[in-house]
């Protein structure tokens, strides 16, 4: 079955996540989210490898607190080690921290991964602190 779809893309601006260009004339990107505990470092690495080998271009991890930020740092380090020692059958893709409610966690995660995903609605409570950058 040969299905031809035509559509007009909205005009957007290019942005980059790590070395990956998104938007504008660039192709739609494949993003997935790990379903392992971010603190299960070895399990997360194995799942990341599987996702990247299957073609994922962005990989998101839930990041509830500082412990997960540290785990993400270790995951990133191990994936890069595999790439540099030649044992990887994949290219390391940008990692994304999925953060809710905690601006300090988002700030810390931004030092570790290429992208931090937040829900801005989570930050509207004036009782919560948010650092102006």
Residue ranges and their predicted role:
Residues 17, 24-43, 62, 92-102:
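Active-site mouth loops of central-metabolism enzymes
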Residues 44, 48-51, 75, 108-109:
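Generic structural signal for hydrophobic
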Residues 2-23, 36-38:
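N-terminal basic/disordered segments at the start of proteins
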Residues 35, 52-79, 120-130:
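Glycine-rich, proline-tolerant flexible connector loops at the mouths of alpha/beta enzymes
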Residues 46-59, 86-89, 102:
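Repeat-based scaffolding regions
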Residues 12, 17, 24-28, 54-56, ...:
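Short coil/turn connectors at secondary-structure junctions
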Residues 99, 103-133:
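Active-site-proximal beta-alpha core segment in soluble small-molecule metabolic enzymes
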Residues 63-112:
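N-terminal active-site wall of soluble small-molecule enzyme domains
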């Amino acid at each position: 079955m040969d299905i031809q779809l035509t559509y007009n893309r909205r005009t957007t601006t290019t942005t980059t996540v790590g070395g990956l260009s998104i938007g504008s004339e660039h192709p739609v990107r494949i993003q997935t989210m790990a379903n392992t505990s971010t603190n299960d470092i070895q399990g997360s690495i194995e799942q990341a490898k599987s996702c990247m080998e299957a073609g994922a271009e962005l990989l998101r991890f839930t990041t509830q607190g500082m412990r997960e930020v540290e785990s993400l740092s270790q995951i990133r380090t191990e994936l890069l080690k595999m790439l540099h020692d030649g044992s990887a059958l994949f290219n390391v893709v940008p990692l994304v921290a999925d953060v809710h409610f905690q601006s300090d966690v988002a700030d810390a995660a931004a030092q570790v991964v290429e992208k931090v995903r937040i829900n801005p609605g989570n930050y509207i409570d004036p009782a919560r602190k948010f650092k102006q950058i």
